[in-house]
A protein has these predicted regions:
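N-terminal helix-rich module
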Residues: 2-7, 29, 33-47, 52-59, ...
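Glycine-centered recognition micro-motifs in short, flexible terminal segments and loops
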Residues: 5-28, 33
Length: 233
């Protein structure tokens, strides 16, 4: 007499179509929920990186002034800005407009505070979806000593000024590394300010987040971010 063997079920059978649809739906929902946070992270990193680049450019200008004994001028602001009365647009070596340019203007005795052909320059590009000004901040950084008025959205992106407190988009670093404001003519540096006139703030935004870079009157640089509690120090 034969004993009936138990039926063996195949536990390796594939999942059903309904189960597959459910799994894919869960994956899609998780991915959709993660996209905004990823985009926010990328936006923050891009803006933070640009703010740090601006701060680094100030530090480069200061160190170059001390090293070479030449005037170094930092020009900055929205694309299309110029070097003042001379009207030279801020561009890189390829002719592309840039948000910041460091110019080696030569020894103080011969410097003219304008961008001339052949002068050494350093530039940085403007990242996509980043601009000058603020979108959330309501006040300037407390340690921003720039004399130009601050009024959101501050489309100039700066509080830099000349010795008479008129808004500008430049700062001159003397050979001792001290930043000062100046009021150029069409051919010369015009009036160069004393120590204390070069403090300024730069403000950049992604449309939903704001960062600032402050240049102290003696040349130190700090990067700040805006939050509900105000600017970080």
């Amino acid at each position: 007499m034969r004993i009936a063997q138990p039926v063996r079920r195949n536990h390796r059978a594939g999942i059903s179509l309904i189960e597959l649809v459910v799994v894919l739906g869960i994956i899609a929902a998780l991915a959709a929920a993660a996209i905004p946070s990823i985009q926010d992270m990328l936006e923050r990193r891009r803006l933070q990186g640009f703010a740090r680049d601006l701060g680094n450019m100030f530090q480069i200008a200061r160190s170059q002034a001390i090293r070479t004994g030449n005037n170094q001028i930092a020009y900055f602001g929205p694309l299309g800005n110029t070097d003042g009365p001379a009207g030279n647009v801020l561009v890189d070596s390829a002719g592309e407009t840039v948000p910041m340019l460091i110019l080696d203007d030569g020894p103080p005795a011969t410097a003219n505070c304008h961008i001339d052909f052949g002068e050494s320059r350093e530039t940085i590009p403007l990242p996509n979806e980043i601009g000058f000004g603020v979108s959330e901040a309501t006040v300037k950084v407390p340690t921003d000593t720039g004399s130009a008025a601050f009024s959101p959205p501050q489309t100039s992106g700066t509080t830099a000024s000349d010795p008479s407190n008129n808004p500008t988009n430049w700062v001159l670093f003397r050979p001792d590394g001290i930043p000062v404001g100046f009021d150029p003519t069409s051919t010369t540096c015009g009036t160069i300010g004393d120590t204390g006139t070069g403090g300024a703030g730069l403000y950049v935004t992604s449309g939903g987040r704001d960062y600032a870079v402050t240049l102290a009157p003696l040349g130190s640089v700090r990067v700040h971010t805006w939050s509900e509690a105000g600017w970080t120090q």
